[in-house]
């Protein structure tokens, strides 16, 4: 495998579910460990989750990049793949591509007061940024979260 392919975000990586919890009737949380290292994402990015024989779907990473060893996803059962994900549990494997997407401009936020506004599952992609801010609390001003 060439170095370029090895380091490509499009390369399919194996991820094992190391924890899972049904949050609501339609949302399930997963903690996933890649078999070849950390995800190395930034707040606001997403991954493509592949279930072998089912397909792929984009899902926002909801853990902070400061969390090492695994990453978290919250999945709403809305389509074929995401409904099937709700049947998965600890020990099951999924395919992961990514991270993808333009991250939040964290460096521009440094020293500023922050207001997070979200509704429903919209808090999941913000959770990555919120946890990053908590983990780097001294770098930010007042933090407020409005959840509807």
What is the predicted function of each stretch?
Residues 2-92, 148:
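Ferredoxin-reductase
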Residues 3, 80-148:
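FNR/FR-type flavoprotein reductase catalytic core
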């Amino acid at each position: 495998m060439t170095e370029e392919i090895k380091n490509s975000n499009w390369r399919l990586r194996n991820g094992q579910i190391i924890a899972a919890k049904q949050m609501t009737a339609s949302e399930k949380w997963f903690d996933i460990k890649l078999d070849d290292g950390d995800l190395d994402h930034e707040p606001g990015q997403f991954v493509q989750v592949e279930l072998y024989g089912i397909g792929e779907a984009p899902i926002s990473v909801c853990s902070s990049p400061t969390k090492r060893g695994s990453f978290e996803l919250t999945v709403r059962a809305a389509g074929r793949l995401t409904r099937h994900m709700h049947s998965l549990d600890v020990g099951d494997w999924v395919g992961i591509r990514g991270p993808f997407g333009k991250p939040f401009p964290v460096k521009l936020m440094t020293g500023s007061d922050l207001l997070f506004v979200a509704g429903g599952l919209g808090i999941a992609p913000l959770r990555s940024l919120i946890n990053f801010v908590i983990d780097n609390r001294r770098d930010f001003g007042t933090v407020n979260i409005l959840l509807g």
